[in-house]
Amino acid sequence: MKTIEVKVERTISAPPGEVFDAWLDSKTPGTPWNIGNKVLLNPKVDGLFYLKGKSVPHYGRFTEMERPARMQHTWVSPNTLGEESTVTVTFKKHGDDTLMTLVHTGIPDTEAGRGHEKGWKYFLDIFPEQFGNGPRKEK
């Protein structure tokens, strides 16, 4: 099966550690953990997550956790046809700010799979607002 990759970058007005921690907080608007009515989140290596959003459930397992620079987890939903895909998020110091880069690989090249780009951009347009600034879109 052919797969695609989604990459979204944002510059956020806060240091990497603060951005990293906020991204893993289910109370922070603009994170994938802050959707729907049911969230189970265990953000550590081999920790699992389950999200029941408005339309479809998502689940996965954290495979890397290197605070404050990088995290990686699997991502499974009906939109990935039940197959594991991989989400890697990096947080790099960029002057006084943080360059946050999200790369989602292994997404099926289907209409539902291609919808992940819109979804991640939605989150990463809201998330920077928690730090007192709107998004500054790079890609």
Question: How does the language model describe each region?
Answer:
Residues 1-5:
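Short acidic N-proximal helix/loop "leader" segments that mark the beginning
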Residues 7-8, 14, 25-57, 70, ...:
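Short beta-edge strand/loop motif at the mouth of beta-sheet-based domains
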Residues 99, 105-139:
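A conserved amphipathic terminal alpha-helix motif
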Residues 24-25, 125:
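Solvent-exposed alpha-helix faces
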Residues 39-40, 44, 52-96, 105:
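Hydrophobic-ligand binding "helix-grip"
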Residues 22-23, 65:
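Conserved catalytic core of Hanks-type protein kinase domains
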